[in-house]
Amino acid sequence: MAYTLPQLPYAYDALEPNIDAQTMEIHHTKHHQTYINNVNAALEGTEYADLPVEELVSKLKSLPENLQGPVRNNGGGHANHSLFWTVMSPNGGGEPKGEVAKAIDKDIGGFEKFKEAFTKAALSRFGSGWAWLSVTPDKKVVVESTANQDSPLFEGNTPILGLDVWEHAYYLKYQNRRPDYIGAFYNVVNWDEVERRYHAAIA
């Protein structure tokens, strides 16, 4: 069964003024859709076409060599963006509560230390990529970054929060001001969804 573009859980303009409607619409309907089209084309007629995309990308290193490039770039793009849309909300922002807050305190040293590390991961990623809060196989939370459309799933970690720092994610509004975009992202983080994903990752 072919992958399809997930519906956003809010309107394109819902994250204004932090992320503008034009960027959201182009990012969702053009960039994300292209990753889906390309991974569907690569997988057509293979035994992997019916796998959930997260399972597909987690198996990257065991896939046939001719599929590894398309899955890395386009399967990764689909998985990453599918998470990205859900971890933002017009009612987002603030600080995490519950178990994920406790995990951040224990493993990273508190919310301010997390913000410092996450901002650094997003700022220092040269070129295109992502910043992540992920859960390791031993159930610790870590901040990491990946290049291009690489996913923490490639290395066995489970992403629970991600920030897209490709220029297409922010350039229309922020031009080259990536720090401003990163700062705005904290205003829309959907910590309830991050908490849900944390519980799923440690289950």
Curated annotation (Swiss-Prot):
Leader sequence segment: none
Textual note on the cofactor: Binds 1 Mn(2+) ion per subunit.
GO biological process: removal of superoxide radicals
Keywords: Manganese, Metal-binding, Oxidoreductase
A Pfam family the protein falls into: Sod_Fe_C
Domain of life: Bacteria
InterPro entries xref list: Mn/Fe_SOD (IPR001189), Mn/Fe_SOD_BS (IPR019833), Mn/Fe_SOD_C (IPR019832), Mn/Fe_SOD_N (IPR019831), Mn/Fe_SOD_N_sf (IPR036324), SOD_C_sf (IPR036314)
Annotated EC: 1.15.1.1
Keyword ATP-binding (UniProt): no
Reactions mediated catalytically: 2 superoxide + 2 H(+) = H2O2 + O2
Ranges that cross the membrane: none
Sites where the protein binds Mn(2+): 27, 81, 164, 168
Cofactors (names): Mn(2+)
GO cellular component, one term: cytoplasm
Keyword Metal-binding on entry: yes
GO molecular function: metal ion binding; superoxide dismutase activity
PANTHER family hit by this protein: 37S RIBOSOMAL PROTEIN S26, MITOCHONDRIAL, SMALL RIBOSOMAL SUBUNIT PROTEIN MS42
Function: Destroys superoxide anion radicals which are normally produced within the cells and which are toxic to biological systems.
Family in the record: Belongs to the iron/manganese superoxide dismutase family.
Name of the protein in question: Superoxide dismutase [Mn]
